[in-house]
């Protein structure tokens, strides 16, 4: 019984993580556009970021915190600003 419950918890956790990563991707897209970059590939190219990888971040791929901080600095966005209202999406 414990094994079955732990499997359900794992699925719930993975689903929750997926939702948060999608939200992070949506926020990255929002702030990129707010910074004046209509195209994600152009933003990545201009800032020496792998274009395919940046596209994956906006699509909801897992992103390391240090990478997120670096990208936000390029957009002149603080972590506080980035996560303000995060749960309202």
Residues covered by each model-derived region:
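Alpha-helical residues within helix-turn-helix
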Residues: 30, 41-42, 70
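Alpha-helical residues within the helix-turn-helix
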Residues: 33, 45, 73
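Short coil turns linking two alpha-helices in DNA-binding domains
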Residues: 50-52, 64, 78
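DNA major-groove recognition helix of helix-turn-helix/homeodomain DNA-binding modules
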Residues: 66-81
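Short amphipathic recognition helices of helix-turn-helix/homeodomain-type DNA-binding modules
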Residues: 83-89
